[in-house]
Amino acid sequence: MRRLNLISSILTFVIRNPKALLIALLVGGLSYSYEVFIARDTMAFAGIPKAMDNSIPTYTRIFRNSAYMVGYSDIKGNPLWVVYKLTPPSENASRLKRPENFNADWRNFGFIDSNDYTNSGYDRGHMAPNHAISLLYGKQAQIETFLMTNITPQKPSLNQKLWQRLEEIELESFTSKFKEVWVYTGPLFDEKITHLKSSRFVEIPDAFYKIYAGIEENGTIKVLAVIVPQNAKTNDRIEKYIVINEASGIIHHQNRRQCH
């Protein structure tokens, strides 16, 4: 209510002061141009994802955070894509305590909050990973990974097992092979729409993808992509779900103990 009253007061002031309106439009235009043409490009590898089939509801609003960027679907109550960059972590990097709470994102008008997942049978699954982001980018960036616009429904057997192993491998192994690793990740949906039993606003994904682009010191790019179904078994090998592998053994024998 206070926020609505504040917005109403600001609008009333602007309408009664035409010069203020012109200044507001100018500042807003410059801010938008900076966001779209400069800021976003620094946080995405090869640009913002585009829809290949306009018949599919893929409209997203883009939210830029300290260490990752989100293409969020209000229709599905899910991030359709999240992009972040990994680099080799410093040996002196602080291991920060995990935040206790998930938070509604004000940019989503608080439409989805943590309670939407309560008693749903699904975990609040991070797309931009808490641990890696905290090691590389610090406390504020870590807190932002607990925004609900970074969260998607994952079965506990996936979120706490195979998906977690993927996050460990990308941070510990992939970053040791490349100068930097760009990651695009998000949920996939089939034609049948199913929502959380605890919320009619959050659609349940059928699978999840991760696309890795590893940049070598000489600029060579190696690509790896995986699609992991929601019902993946906890002891499945990650190699089973590779759909693109141009990474010359990016998942090598040393890691295979972790991939079982």
Where are these regions (language model features)?
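Domain-level detector of nuclease and nuclease-like folds
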Residues: 106-260
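Short, His- and charge-rich active-site/binding loops that engage polyanionic ligands
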Residues: 63-124
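Short linear sequence motifs
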Residues: 25-27, 38, 61, 95, ...
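N-terminal module-boundary/linker segments of secreted carbohydrate-active enzymes
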Residues: 2, 20-79
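N-terminal Lys/Arg-rich, disordered targeting/topogenic segments
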Residues: 1-15
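Generic hydrophobic, helix-prone segments enriched in Leu/Val/Ile
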Residues: 10, 34, 41-48, 102, ...
